[in-house]
Amino acid sequence: LDPVVIDYDRDVLPLTPAGNATERHMVVAYLAAVRRTVSDQTAFWAEKLHRSRDEIDGILNNGPKIQNLVRATLMKRGGVGYVQPSPETFPSVEEVNHVITACGALPCATWLDGTSAGEQAEEELLELLIGKGVVALNIVPDRNWNIADPEVKRTKLLELYKIVDLARHLDLPLNVGTEMNAPGNRLVDDFAAPELGPVREAFMDSAAFIYGHTAMQRALGLGYGSAWAHAHFPTRKARNVFYTQAGRIIPPGKAGTARLKAISAASTETDPRVVLARLIEGQ
């Protein structure tokens, strides 16, 4: 990107909440540097990204689109900033899942849209990941129904329905939604969309499960991965049922926290049926 230069400490780190810079922060820093130092931004980006002036002109003032183009061209596979990972680049799946569980969280598998070669063997992949500690599956439904091309939409909707059915078969609750990692993403998914009708119940059940686990872990340390949960629910399916029930009972916000904390501190020895009964009594 010569002659544009950025300084990591000066230009990138101030964009982060806690010094945890990602490639997106670097893209924003470069875009800002170009605005400060280049008189013809369109010409600059057209040359560096190997695009036409018209294409750059059409997105230059659209933050998410120009950011995504810069990131995809320079930082993804084939780009000058891409480094091919090796087996030593990242910790193992088992190590990551152990850390996640130790934090009281839920190790999740991820699913894109069902069209890649790997996701065509999704059952085999999920069974492998379950063996490594995964207990839930993350889905971004917008990718599979909010699509302009009718044929692509039809194909991806079928893949969505298939993965939800497979998750049910494998006792994997769903963590559904769009991560807030880029401007323009949905804040809340439209579960009322007709296309999501066949999977809405599974999504809502899973939302109750995620909330039930989160609330009980935060207030009592009795989340899905706790020793208490494993002692009382030897199977993932039984744990799923309990935390889904709890999630439907516990009110949101401070009221839910207060109701949970009213349960005896000795609740590590409490029968789950007693926990649910006490939660219901507090309604």
Where are these regions (language model features)?
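Charged catalytic cores and adjacent phosphate/nucleic-acid-binding surfaces used
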Residues: 61-73, 79-283
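Non-catalytic, alpha-helical, charged scaffold/linker segments
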Residues: 1-48, 252
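Short catalytic-site patches enriched in acidic/histidine residues
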Residues: 42-46, 51-57, 70, 81-87
